């Protein structure tokens, strides 16, 4: 009986000593956890500048007294341009699960950016304007365009946006003097007035926020845009004389379209973001 009591006492003593020794051991340091990176918010206004390359095309035919007198002819041009832009964006989370009410979309809440902007492009986008039915040819230049519109996009990452845009646009084409297209050429005496065309545009692109620059708020934006002008055709007067005979009632009915790719460096003020 005494042996059993001594054995129990020894076990209790060993347990107490073991606990005391364990308490004296150094505790492992807590694992280091880096502070979370701040989440950028795209809400705010911005300015940007850059440039790109553009193409324009047109389908046109000559009229006399409003009646077509030549078949439709296709012409076009291409060239470089500079661009400036201002705009404002607003970022929010789109809870698709609650909006659509479908379990398939449960938990899917992408970050969405919507905004409005205006831009101006100027350059030398030169091309040809020929009227084969009248034996005339000339050089035509798109000198400037401007646009106002809206855009909507999804943040693939907190600093990478893909977007679509669209809106209203105007294009300015300079006037031109026609030459005879046959051998020997020479001035024809006819000219086409400068004209501003109204139209619409759609586009798509992406924008990326630089993370390695010391200045926060710098972005790189690339966009592809298609614009169409003239609706069912704009009638532009032909003026002058041929062989000393004044030309009256003649015009060129024209529809135009442009395509361009541009890249801009953007600075975002982020007044309302974080």
Q: What are these language model-derived features?
A:
Residues 2-274:
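Gram-negative outer-membrane beta-barrel domains
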